[in-house]
Structures are given as C-alpha cells and as structure tokens.
Amino acid sequence: ASDDSAADDSAADGSVFKIGSIGPTTGDAAIYGNAVMNAAQMAVDEINAAGGANGYQLAFNAEDDQNDAEKSVNAYNSLKDWGMQILMGTVTTTPCVAVADKTAEDGMFEITPSASSTDVITNDNVFQACFTDPNQGTASAQYIADNNLGTKVAVIYDSSSVYSSGIEATFVEEAQNKGLEVV
C-alpha cells in the first residue's frame, strides 16, 4: 500500500481527501495493476504539488488483490477502515464485480479504470472509465468489414478468460452481421 505522507500530515485538520485503489500488484495480472497504481500515484503527487484539489490534499492508498475476488473484498474493507472516501478500482473484472456489491451496500463511489465487463456496472454507484468488452468486439469486427481488410477471419481467444470470451462473442456476432465468415 502507498500513502502520500504530505496528504496524511494535513489529515489532522480535515483537509485531506482519501482515494483508495485495489488491483493486482503481484501475480499473473500485476502488469495491469502496477500500471494503474503508478499512474494514479503520479497524478496524486502532481495534484498535491500544485496545491491540491479545491483546498484538499489527496491521500492515495493502493491495495494488492492479486486478481482474486476474495482478496479484493478484504482490501476494500481495509481501505474503508483507513477512511477511504472514493474507490478507484478495482483494476480487473472478477474482483471488481465482487467489490461492486460491497460499494453499493456502503454507498461508496467506485470508478474502475480498466475492468471492462458489463457485469461491473450493474449498480448505480459504479462507473467504468474504459470501453466495455462488447464495444471492443463489435468495433473490431466493424473496422475489419468497413475497411475491407478481409472476408474470412479467425478468432484466437482464451476460453478460460471472461475478458477474452466477452470480446470474442461480440466480435463473432458483429462479424456475421457484417457478412464476414468466421473460420
């Protein structure tokens, strides 16, 4: 976990806004979590160096969920205990779906930068900053058809991955709608 110490110093007078984040910083999906956490920490540091946001310094605390739903819920509870006021995350879909129900129960605002399944946004308090899986599959098939890049296409995907399967399903559907032959 990372905290911005300058922001923590201002917490005593109530002028700090606490941002929590959850994502894989270790394990097979760490490349995604580390990219998000590093970018968020850079943004917090830049905002704080420029005087903060509307009179508030930002504190950022990132928790590792190892791309595991149960660990993600535990991380969420830890961040709540820390005093988190907004959740940026989680980074990957399965943990995000698990945490979204908890944030809905608590009325916590949640925005995911990268969990792309439509299952993520079933609660009114959860938002996606990225495109959804169906958008990716549909747009890819449309691009191939609209730019005459071929009439026969093959799809290679990981059937054990919710992310990959979601894109594949909408790609195949749109490819067929566009007259492409999926082999």
Language-model regions, residue ranges each:
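An alpha-beta-alpha
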Residues: 126-183
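Short, polar/charged alpha-helical segment
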Residues: 31-54, 169-176
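Second-shell loop/turn segments in exported
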Residues: 25-31, 62-65, 84-86, 124-130, ...
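Short, low-complexity disordered leader/linker segments with a strong preference
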Residues: 1-18, 49
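Short, well-ordered beta-strand elements
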Residues: 15-24, 58-62, 152-155
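Amphipathic, non-transmembrane alpha-helical secondary structure
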Residues: 41, 70-80, 97, 138-146, ...
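Beta-alpha junction/loop-to-helix N-cap segments that form part of ligand/metal-binding clefts
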Residues: 16, 31-36, 50-119
